[in-house]
């Protein structure tokens, strides 16, 4: 049985393996560790424990543990001779009955930055293929004449997906000259001839590469094009061949009348009726150009999902999950150079390099730390670890959400994938 353990001063892979009945090799593999490197105080590890024993960690509650292991709260309390309101103590041993995993769908986005695609990125894609329902290739860019600008090596990526019984997604964006374009979108939405040509080209491309989900990530669309975008999606839906699905990306909203160009065009209720599923970008509260904070704090994410559920069936919702963190220089000032994107593995390596402990914000459910670099500049880092993604998995269970969508491949986070299949059964449709 897998459990999450927070490293304390003096802990090592060997001492943790001995304490929890695991092996050093298992801990190293599951957490993507280098056996020669020391552990970081505050680092979260996943450990395969002996039998069905669980050892209470900081921040635990019976409810949280019952969610994590898919066991009814009352059953967990009864088998351990506890009341539902029992106070748990760090280190306390509990017995965890066998739970039942729910089936969900999963997506991961691939966004190559080089031509040809780096072999390391190709290998990373192959490695996580078993954990995916869909592989989203970002992106096919819409053009004003109704054609598509293809990303590099599309056939290769589509083949990798299908070889793993994963559905390749045709991700179409309104990106023009590197930015999402409202003007480009208006051309396509308002000209029937161009729109029909555009849809025809999309369907031909999807058939060519075996991409059985058509996905639109249209952002920064003019508010006055809201209804035109809904009509366009209905038009696409009516032309889809049998066996194909339609999906969209949505910005994170908490109400129908939320103002701002990023929010007004995305009509949750209409899209929930039209498309087969939606991907909600429940991340970037902490973003590169803003002050340091958790990228996907649990409270705001929950608020978005609750609103989404009021507008569409929860099984149509794919919760967005970042695989990245950010490293900000302090003090933060508007106009500073953007924060540096960083993987979970790289974040822990930074904490180790500068010999600083990792702290955990239980309100946001996110790890973070501060350090001073060689030039005396202070930094603040927020990222994801096994605790933070487990809190999101628990939220998915609580809200009955249909799946999860990861941005993006190439940012190592081995703990996530192991925990994903410990929590859920991943639906395969390929």
Curated annotation (Swiss-Prot):
Family (UniProt): Belongs to the glycosyl hydrolase 18 family. Chitinase class II subfamily.
GO MF term list: chitin binding; hydrolase activity, acting on glycosyl bonds; oligosaccharide binding
Keyword Transcription: no
InterPro entries: CFLE_GH18, Chitinase_II/V-like_cat, Chitinase_insertion_sf, Glyco_hydro18_cat, Glycoside_hydrolase_SF, LysM_dom, LysM_dom_sf
Pfam families, alphabetized: Glyco_hydro_18, LysM
Domain GH18: 104-430
Occurrences of domain LysM (ranges): 3-47, 52-96
Reported phenotype of the disruption mutant: The inactivation of the gene does not affect vegetative growth, spore viability, or the initial stages of germination, including dipicolinic acid release. However, germination of mutant spores is slightly delayed and mutants retain more diaminopimelic acid and N-acetylmuramic acid during germination than wild-type spores.
rRNA-binding recorded as keyword: no
Protein name: Cortical fragment-lytic enzyme
Active site: 219 (proton donor)
EC number(s) given by UniProt: 3.2.1.-
Induction remarks: Expressed during sporulation.
Protein origin, superkingdom: Bacteria
Protein localization: Forespore
Enzyme superclass (EC): hydrolase
